[in-house]
Amino acid sequence: MNDLCNRYGSCVLKPLGRKDRIIAFPWGNEDTETLIEIFDQYNVKVTFFVVGEWVDKYPESVKALHDAGHEVMGHSNDHAHFNSLSADQIIADITACNEKIKAVTGVSPTLVRPPYGEYDDHVVSTVRGMGLEIIQWDVETLATGAMPWGARV
């Protein structure tokens, strides 16, 4: 990860000396209220990266996350591989997702987490040209095994 950050001059990695956590995972909305309750119980605020299609399906969950004080940021509109898209396609994809998030929360996202963690010079320059920053994970949750998420929270 640090090699990628060095290559692109900057990279946002959380936590930034604080106890911030960023969560991005595919899920329905059946556990949204449970997640909010657990995070509230521990006084934890989270940045959720959501796909625009998820916002379409579950706007009430996006609003609930936002209303509970969590950040909602973009993770693309339809989980496309940004590395294989033109600049115009990337811009259209991110814009569509961000407009959906803003319509529900009233807040324009400032961060983008590229699908599959894929990005290159082309993607970085396109995203930064939109006035946004790319954020990346530093823990791969698939490596944690089959432990239920509630046991890890």
What function would you assign to each model-found segment?
Residues A103-M130:
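Basic- and aromatic-lined ligand-binding clefts that recognize polyanionic substrates
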Residues E33, S84, H122-V124, M147:
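Hydrophobic alpha-helical membrane-insertion segments
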Residues V124-V153:
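His/Asp/Glu-enriched short active-site or ligand-binding loop at hydrolase and phosphoryl-transfer sites
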Residues L65, I91-A92, Y116, V127, ...:
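Alpha-helix boundary/capping detector
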Residues M1-H81, L85, Q89-P109, L142:
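Active-site beta->alpha N-cap acidic-glycine motif
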Residues S76-D78, Y116-E118, D138:
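Short, flexible active-site-adjacent loop segments at beta-strand->alpha-helix junctions, enriched
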